[in-house]
């Protein structure tokens, strides 16, 4: 199993886990095609949080272009019968879903009500 993380506080959790920290696009580009069974991801929301990691795009279009780069890699590395779960802020979720539907067969939208 490979787990890509941005949080440096997460540590190696066992002998079957390859924990990698870094830019997820660079790490995914190095992964073989059709090699992943499940992708569960919580990308930045786009200007919801006050932190720099969530405010690195000037426009929604720039954020969505970056998000589409992620989706391109997910499509490449995910096995044909693999699953993808991604979180999105409600304010931009509709646009994110349009991008996802261009590349994947969306079976269900799950709403997490906190």
Regions found by a protein language model. Name each.
Residues 2-114:
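Core catalytic lobe of class I
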């Amino acid at each position: 199993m490979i787990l890509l993380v941005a949080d440096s506080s997460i540590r190696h959790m066992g002998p079957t886990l390859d924990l990698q920290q870094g830019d997820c696009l660079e790490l995914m580009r190095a992964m073989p095609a059709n090699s992943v069974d499940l992708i569960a991801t919580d990308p930045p929301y786009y200007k919801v949080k006050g932190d720099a990691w969530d405010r690195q795009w000037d426009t929604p279009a720039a954020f969505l272009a970056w998000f589409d780069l992620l989706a391109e890699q997910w499509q490449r590395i995910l096995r044909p019968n693999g699953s993808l779960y991604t979180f999105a802020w409600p304010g931009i979720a509709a646009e994110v879903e349009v991008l996802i539907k261009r590349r994947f067969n969306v079976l269900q939208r799950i709403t997490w009500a906190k």
